[in-house]
Each structure stands twice: as structure tokens, then as C-alpha cells.
Amino acid sequence: MSSSQLEQAITDLINLFHKYSGSDDTIEKEDLLRLMKDNFPNFLGACEKRGRDYLSNIFEKQDKNKDRKIDFSEFLSLLADIATDYHNHSHGAQLCSGGNQ
């Protein structure tokens, strides 16, 4: 049985997380920054044009339990923030315009 488009998208997100996570299934700060630079160049470029350094505190903001690692649920929270920004962009807002960042 083939996966639906949304099921495939979720599988792709899991694979992306695993690409940057370590053997303990968490992402460390340097790897999160690399993930962001590798996978969100347009978003980060929009932030830069607006004078916002999105990466400067993203790790600390997303590390909810303060263990200095990003687990999968914290990763999903980060993606939700970015997806919300893209959703707002679809309604005319500029990328990286605030909100959950």
C-alpha cells in the first residue's frame, strides 16, 4: 500500500530529523544550526533582510526541557513556528515577520 502525500511528508520530516540527530535521537546545537541553514535558506534569507538574526536564540527557545539537546517533539515545535510563518506569508505577510519567532 502506498503512502498518502501527508504520510510521505511526515516520513520525510522524520528522515530529516534522523539525518541531523545523533545516536541518542536528539539534535545538538551545531547540528540544528546546520539543519536550518541547509533546509531553510529562503526563510533565513528573509529574516536577514528584515534585520532579524533568527538563529541567534532558536536553540535556547526550542530546548524546552533545557537539556541542551533538541528531541523530536522540540523539533516539531520549531517546524510548527516556521510553518506558521509560511502560512501567514500565504496571506500576505512577509516571511520572518514575527509571530512565533
Curated annotation (Swiss-Prot):
Residues 8-42, 50-85 form the EF-hand domain. The modification N-acetylserine is found at S2. InterPro entries: EF-hand-dom_pair, EF_Hand_1_Ca_BS, EF_hand_dom, S-100_dom, S100/CaBP7/8-like_CS, S100_Ca-bd_sub. SMART domains: EFh, S_100. Zn(2+) binds at H18, D25, H87, H91. GO terms for biological process: endothelial cell migration. Keywords: Acetylation, Allergen, Calcium, Cytoplasm, Metal-binding, Repeat, Secreted, Zinc. Transmembrane segments: none annotated. Its main location: cytoplasm. It comes from the Eukaryota. Ca(2+) binds at D63, N65, D67, K69, E74. GO terms for molecular function: calcium ion binding; calcium-dependent protein binding; transition metal ion binding. One of its GO terms (cellular component) is extracellular region. It is found in: Cytoplasm; Secreted. Interacts with RANBP9. This is Protein S100-A7. It comes from Bos taurus.
